[in-house]
Amino acid sequence: MEVIDKFHSHDGEQLIVKHYSSSNKCEMKFSLFLPPASRSGKVPIIWYLSGLTCSHANVTEKGEYRQKASELGIAFICPDTSPRGENIPDEKDNWQFGSGAGFYVDATQDPYNQNYNMFSYVTDELPKLVFENFPVKEETQGIMGHSMGGHGALITCLLYTSDAADEVDG
């Protein structure tokens, strides 16, 4: 794991991190905003899943969540939407499949099942990495998303929350 970019915003730190993903068998990136409260202890975290054709960078660069996250003492993480790279199978003629379109599910068919395992990545591999390396609370987290990311957030909530009716707000 390597922090490849870092800047200060609203008294917190915005990080861009890359690491090797065993789920997707490639390098992945995510952005993580740590509020000032994280300097003195663990803070709650919100997972934001971006939509179709996006990456970790879209909401990091265009959305302004940092001021409110800083005020509330909440970390904010944005994983990439799919595996990327020259050796990753892709549907180059169809923007709805492949890079930028992982749909936060695990592929079941060759050749995609070797790399497109975004559900396992965002629900297992990435959380373990984040909880082991950053001052965030595993017991206090939320998830949301936009478009394809909303789908990913919804299926995650439905599969991992015992009383999803109280958790889902549409």
Per-region residue spans from a language model:
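Conserved HGGG/HGGXW glycine-rich cap/lid loop of the alpha/beta-hydrolase fold
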Residues: 55-57
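Alpha/beta-hydrolase active-site loop
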Residues: 98-133
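Alpha/beta-hydrolase fold nucleophile elbow
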Residues: 135-146
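Glycine-rich nucleophile elbow surrounding the catalytic serine of serine-hydrolase chemistry
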Residues: 146-155
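Short beta-strand element of the alpha/beta-hydrolase
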Residues: 42-51
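Active-site machinery of serine-nucleophile hydrolases
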Residues: 62-109
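Conserved small/polar residues in nucleotide/adenosyl-binding loops
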Residues: 160-165
